[in-house]
Amino acid sequence: MLCLRWCNPFLGQAGWLICFWHTFYYLLHHENMIRKIIYGVYAILGMMTMAACSGQSDASEISLEKMHGFPTENTGFLKGVSALYAGVIEGNLLIAGGCNFPDIPVADGGKKAYYRDIYIAPLSNDTAFEWKKIGQLPQAAAYGVTISTEKGLICVGGTTATHSLSDVFLLSLQKDTLKRETLPSLPVTMDNMAGALVGHSLYIVGGNVNGIPSSAMYMLDLSDLSGGWKRETDIPGEPRVQPVCVAQDGKLYVWGGFAPAVEGHQASLSVDGYMYSPETKEWS
């Protein structure tokens, strides 16, 4: 069981420094030199995360626990999948699609398999999930973006075994029945991107655009779908495949990402981050 708990989010900056030094002191006296360095970095990152979370004054306890149970209908799926569409809908955890190498590992030349099934599991205080298949994606796909909204989960783009996607649709539950509503398609195909919701505006950033690593950003106003997707200001720096994106206080934040080598451009790894203001349409 993996379990990480801290019970007082009000320690403040000094409190987190004390926690950090206690953790680092323990590592120095109980691990060999290589592990000291590695765990020391983990400790710093962990305490930074705790400090960031400490501003949530409505939380008295934060916990991370290992959950058990996985859909069993597909034997290949049982080996674990990555890059699936996922989110919480009507008190249920929903997962859809995804991919893996079910037979031969990628290092040995295995072929990647993509999945189509959609499963839900009720959220409870138990650490075991009870999954139920409730539908299928239009096609087996992975590496898209899933955004939780009041109406359901919006699935954007992604890729199949043969091609990238521009499809956008809303998944919702109505009397335990899965419904799928088509939304305006992206003007390009996109996969391995990130996204977040700022107010009624859905932003999709980075990834592969028409098969090429990109720093582009697109926005869809969910309160006016007739306007379709609009191109917004590109993220500064190099193209960003698989970046991290989050919305906070009316702003959009993007970190990291990479870009493989393509004709005319060397491979790159982005270790910086930027904040986007929808009001000024500028990054800083």
Segments predicted by a language model, with ranges:
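Kelch-like beta-propeller repeat domains
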Residues: 57-284
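Short, low-complexity segments with poor structural confidence in diverse proteins
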Residues: 25-26, 42, 188
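Bacterial N-terminal signal peptides that target proteins for export
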Residues: 32-41
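Basic polycationic patches enriched in arginine
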Residues: 3-5, 35
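Intrinsic-disorder-associated, low-complexity terminal segments enriched in Asp/Asn/His/Tyr and depleted
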Residues: 8, 22-32
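Residue-identity detector for glycine
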Residues: 12-15, 40, 46
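C-terminal motif of bacterial Sec signal peptides marking the signal peptidase cleavage site
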Residues: 51-52
